């Protein structure tokens, strides 16, 4: 696992990377108190998350998954068991163990940190992005130089187009983009950069985008048959 620490004035912002699934996890705190939240944790790294939190003297109060992941088992439930944090997902989530379901445009608060939920279906029908000041956590909806596949978990290329072009790409151009995955060593981007340079976004219509996405012919994620039911039921790997 790799992790990167950014201190923005008082704010604590850590980006951790799971090399097996190429998943980014984010640990965030305002720094003005001791409360923290985590976005998109991977179960294998639960001990590392706890270690980071303890080293920074932070208390985990909320943990968020942007959607039901198909390429890894979430650490959301293990973190809940070990810290009693609140498990958060969008209201469309199929998860059976969520403590707090967030509606589109609803806000999540952890001390002085505020995230606004944006319903961004397409990769899955339960995908949400989260806007925090100058940055947006896009899950698998908008990637760096790519977009999330739309061929499983009730995904829809047409819905993805609407989420991208009518929601995310309408954010201010200098908004930082932090996705749930990257496969080329990139840590973040901006809305302007993705709008101008992302090859998946250089289309002239919803139909053209759907034509591209519906003909990718990708293999299913290796962990899909394990990860999806585990993430819906709230299971840990040792319970499968």
Predicted regions and their residues:
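Short, Lys/Arg-enriched N-terminal segments with co-localized hydrophobic residues
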Residues: 1-10
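Conserved beta-strand hairpin/beta-sheet module of binuclear metal-dependent hydrolase folds
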Residues: 10-59, 129-139, 145
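Active-site HxH/HxHxD metal-binding segment of metal-dependent hydrolases
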Residues: 22, 33-35, 43-119, 196-200
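Core dinuclear metal-dependent hydrolase active-site scaffold
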Residues: 27, 107-132, 170
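Active-site metal-binding loops of divalent metal-dependent hydrolases
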Residues: 41, 68, 92-93, 123-124, ...
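Ser/Thr-glycine-rich phosphate-binding loops at phosphate-binding pockets of nucleotides
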Residues: 61-67, 120, 138-139, 180, ...
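Gly/lys/ser-thr-rich phosphate-binding loops in alpha/beta enzymes
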Residues: 88-90, 95, 107-109, 142, ...
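Accessory terminal helices/loops
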Residues: 162-176, 180-238
């Amino acid at each position: 696992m790799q992790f990167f620490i950014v201190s923005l004035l008082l704010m604590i912002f850590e980006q951790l990377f799971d090399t097996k699934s190429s998943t980014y996890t984010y640990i965030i705190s305002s720094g003005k108190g001791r409360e923290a939240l985590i976005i998109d944790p991977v179960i294998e790294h639960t001990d590392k998350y706890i270690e980071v939190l303890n080293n920074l003297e932070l208390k985990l109060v909320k943990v968020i998954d942007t959607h039901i992941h198909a390429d890894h088992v979430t650490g959301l439930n293990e973190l809940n068991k070990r810290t009693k944090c609140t498990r958060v997902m969008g209201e469309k989530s199929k998860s059976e163990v969520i403590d707090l379901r967030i509606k589109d445009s609803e806000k999540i608060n952890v001390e002085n940190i505020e995230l606004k939920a944006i319903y961004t279906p397409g990769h899955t029908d339960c995908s949400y992005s989260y806007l925090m000041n100058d940055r947006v956590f896009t899950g698998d909806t908008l990637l760096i130089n790519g977009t999330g596949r739309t061929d499983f978990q009730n995904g829809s290329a047409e819905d993805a187009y609407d989420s991208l072009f009518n929601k995310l790409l309408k954010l201010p151009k200098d908004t930082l983009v932090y996705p749930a995955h990257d496969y080329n060593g990139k840590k973040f981007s901006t809305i302007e950069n993705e709008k101008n340079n992302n090859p998946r976004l250089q289309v002239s219509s919803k139909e053209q985008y759907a034509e591209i996405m519906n003909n990718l012919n990708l293999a299913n994620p290796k962990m899909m048959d394990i990860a999806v039911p585990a993430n819906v039921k709230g299971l840990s790997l040792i319970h499968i």
